[in-house]
Swiss-Prot record:
Organism: Helicobacter pylori (strain P12)
SUPFAM superfamilies in UniProt: Peptidyl-tRNA hydrolase-like
Enzyme class: hydrolase
EC number(s) recorded for this UniProt protein: 3.1.1.29
Gene3D superfamilies the UniProt entry points to: Peptidyl-tRNA hydrolase
Annotated protein name in UniProt: Peptidyl-tRNA hydrolase
């Protein structure tokens, strides 16, 4: 079993902000698979079970994401953990994968690292860096960024679909890494 976590902040106030990239990508995946999330008060998260994957969207706010992840991890005992999250150190249009390592100042990852360790897989989606970090991550994408954001989120969703079928992180990493921003043709 694999625990697949999309990071974000709950409530409509934060819907579709840069920091909610993980939520948006998991929502798109679940929608395409014609499934739905149900709320689990036990884990304070929305859950969706598909094959041998538990998809999880913590409802604790970003800085406490580790609480939901730890609860689900202790209950389901997954063999693997994959976190889908925004990364402001990567330009918009870039997707990278990583196993373990530092949290890059990402408070959701800090919370998970503190409670669960940092030896998990990551799907990192670039959101670019703004002048004011907090204002930037909590802002929505600009209208001129939408086509690129949509293409990158679609790419990340396809990477997750591939991972669900293959169970092969290295193959997903090799096939779906975008080291340079995705080029959108008009």
């Amino acid at each position: 079993m694999t625990l697949l976590v999309g990071l974000g902040n709950p409530t409509l106030r934060y819907a579709h902000t840069r920091h909610n990239a993980g939520f948006d990508i998991l929502d798109s995946l679940v929608s395409e698979l014609d499934l739905s999330f149900t709320f689990s008060s036990k884990h304070n998260a929305y859950l969706c079970v598909y094959k041998d994957f538990i998809l999880l969207k913590p409802q604790t706010y970003m800085n406490l994401s580790g609480e939901s992840v730890l609860s689900a991890k202790n209950f389901y005992k997954p063999k693997e953990l994959l976190i889908v999250h925004d990364d402001l150190d990567l330009p918009l249009g870039v997707v990278r994968f990583k196993k373990g390592g530092g949290n890059g100042g990402h408070n959701g990852l800090k919370s998970i690292d503190l409670l669960c360790s940092n030896s998990y897989y990551r799907l990192r989606v670039g959101i670019s860096k703004g002048i004011d970090v907090i204002e930037h991550v909590l802002s929505k994408f600009h209208k001129n960024e939408e086509p690129l954001k949509n293409a990158v989120f679609e790419h990340a969703k396809n990477a997750l679909k591939f991972f669900i079928e293959s169970h092969d992180f290295n193959a997903m990493q090799n096939r779906f890494t975008l080291k340079k921003p995705l080029i959108i043709e008009s």
